[in-house]
Amino acid sequence: MASSSSSSVARRQSASLLVSTIMRRGREATTTTRTTHEIVGSGPRWRRHRAYRAAPNDVAGSRARRVPRDGWRDGERRGAMFNHPSSFLKRAVASSPSTQTEQNEPTPMRELRDEFMNANSVAYLEEIERRFKEDGNKGMDQSWSNLLKNLDNGMTGKELSSMWEDAKNGNAPVARERKAALNGSPVPSEGIQESMRLLLLVRAYQMSGHEMATVDPLGMEKKNINVALDPELYGFTEKDLDREFFLGTWRMKGFLAEDQPYWTLRDILSRLKETYCGNIGYEYMHIMDREKCNWLREQIETPTQKGYNTERRKILFERLARAELFETFLSNKYTAAKRFGLEGCETLIPGFEEAVDRAADLGVKNINIGMPHRGRLNVLANVIRKPLQTIFNEFKGGPKPTGELGLSGSQYTGSGDVKYHLGTSVVSRRGTNQDKKVQLSLLANPSHLEAVNTVVIGKCAARQFYYKDIEKDTVIPVLLHGDGAFSGQGIVYETLDMSQLPEYHVGGTLHIVVNNQVAFTTDPKHSRSSMYCTDVAKCIEAPVFHVNGDDVEAVAWAMQLALEWRQKFKADAVVDIVCYRKFGHNEIDEPMFTQPLMYKVIKKHVSAHQQYAGKLIKEGILTADEVKAKQAEILKELETEFELSKNYVPKFRDWVSSHWSGFKSPDQFASIRNTGVDPKILKEVGAKITEIPETFAPHKIVKRVYDARRKMFETGENIDWAAAEMLAFGTLLNEGNHVRLSGQDVERGTFSHRHAVIKDQNTGERFMPLRNLYSDKMDEKGTKYFTICNSSLSEFGVLGFELGYSLDNPNSLVIWEAQFGDFANSAQVIIDQ
């Protein structure tokens, strides 16, 4: 065992030496010096990644750090070489037929950059070694086998350096590699080195390509080239562009999995830039699970995954047209009204609808949505499909809804809130073929940004409970955010933090950020300290897709991918739609006071709808007459609904669950009910909720507590608070009601008084005596009619969750317990709003 351990250490040292040699020679090619400590890295971050079992997800990039705008960045001179007019990479990518047109020179969205390389590169070699040890040569090119054998045999740093020099000087012709591969002979070591350098370059794009993605529709963001993406750093020169390199085909995902072991450097660079530096920037290499990374890589790097056929593109066009014309119609009809329009991010609508259709195809029956005021009316009209005449009625201050018994809205169902805070619930046909019924529910929310987040999650959890959706497949939550709020509001982290907690897990949330690059009047550099507004989502290893808000197909694809991720892995995903806000914070606000340069650009900017219409006309998918006809059809429909709204009288509460039907209004009297329980039933319940299996070994003090409670229930004397509480819960459960209690340390009780959950002192197994009441009649899905759970150390988020849970069905007891009385003030927004 000691020998095996020392051998492993030796291999790791050899692998580390190989990586440092590669990096050192690459740095020499750029005439820039850097200490070994800076490159290799050390400390806790390295130790964290060394424990990672799979292929490294952090080879060419690491933490970003802020620098002064007027100061030199570390490595900026190297990045300048990448941007130089004579740079071979720039010409290579520009001349490639498979890439997009070269973008204008960008400028930093944030003053950050990634350091290049650290010791995680060793983890990459260790992963190759692990596969080699498990499978031998199966599915692996001989070149890797030879490399690992050399490392096992103690290859020296001098030998590695010599191999590098040969490769650097062009002494490794591909013909020799091909001949060796055909003959089954070992591939020359210099070919191995070149392959390794190319794989590091590929990994750099997977890690940091998003930094160079063209996601800003205004083109105002200037970005310095990340030095990790410069091929010269890896020792390649312009003469290597049309050379072929061996990359192998063994068990790789993405484009490297294609049956094409040899690639030219030009093709590789073209494919990488097209994939990672286009209108979508993918952040996923922070995810530690190899299966998840490989799944995403396969979706992202396979071009055939992203295409839309002619029919689907026409649908995207119509939905985009409806989004823009809805805002235009409201602007013309209600010139001075606040509506917090979606102009500048209209692609949200077709993208959101694409996610809903995909969800329906995957079996989703219910979608619970939470969102702020921005674009809310457009989502209500075009995604949820709330009747347009209802929306127009609310604009002109029409009559309030009336209840089933004819009571006025103010007494029963009406809301005094503004129209862009109201919710609704609509069932409609969705799916690719519009043949599946899906209920979409938008929760009402206050002006307090993000406060509705955990309320939505809680309602979703309750719906999953009552639908018996154990697999979390049919009920899903969707949360929309603003960029300033997503990075600024603490409730966002509280929501993310509870995403994988046992009694708060809802199978993942789809997060959509409407990133208009300004928070009311505040620029991003004054509202966050991170590179992206979405960086907080990395704490739960959620993938983040940054997408250009002018590219409707890219937005639709990102939404679809995020939805499929949620359904497959039951985890959160984030779509960051980088867009702009055409007007001020509201329509009567003047944005030129605070963002004059941005709004000069916005005034000249062509809308996404106009851009897409022009694109489809150019490609022959639509004619100019067809575009005009569709626009006229939509405007006519809006005008018809507007006329109908003049006589519209709402008849029901469309934002309230059907479970609440039949409840009395505040000014109605209900009959007095007997709340007492027969003493015989009390004793029976008391006996059951104090039973502990003989095979279970509770703590001796806990056993005394339960023995004392049994005596209380038998005699009816000296019943304390905790015993009375358990008896109350027990009688409700006995009648078939659902009881849920959560909060900090509620299972035991802050003062060690409750002990609703007890632990076996030998095995650690949990036992809940209250579940004795229905354990013999539990249904096939094991429904937990009684739930008690310790929460995260949060008040705001957890109370919001429990409030949302209580909204779905009034026939249940849902309790949040503040650990101490004044701790409730940390959740004051939920209490007040």
Give the ranges of each region predicted by the language model.
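C-terminal catalytic or substrate-handling cores of phosphate/nucleotide-
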Residues: 546, 554, 559-567, 572, ...
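Amphipathic alpha-helical transducer elements in NTP-driven molecular machines
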Residues: 195, 552-559, 609
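Conserved internal helical-beta-strand scaffold that buttresses enzyme catalytic cores
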Residues: 2-29, 35-57, 61-63, 69-72, ...
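Short gly/pro/ser/thr-enriched loop/turn and capping motifs at secondary-structure boundaries
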Residues: 518-520, 554, 582-583
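Flexible glycine-/small-residue-rich
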Residues: 579
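Active-site donor-binding loop signature of nucleotide-sugar glycosyltransferases
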Residues: 549
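Glycine-rich loop/linker segments at domain edges
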Residues: 595-596, 600-601
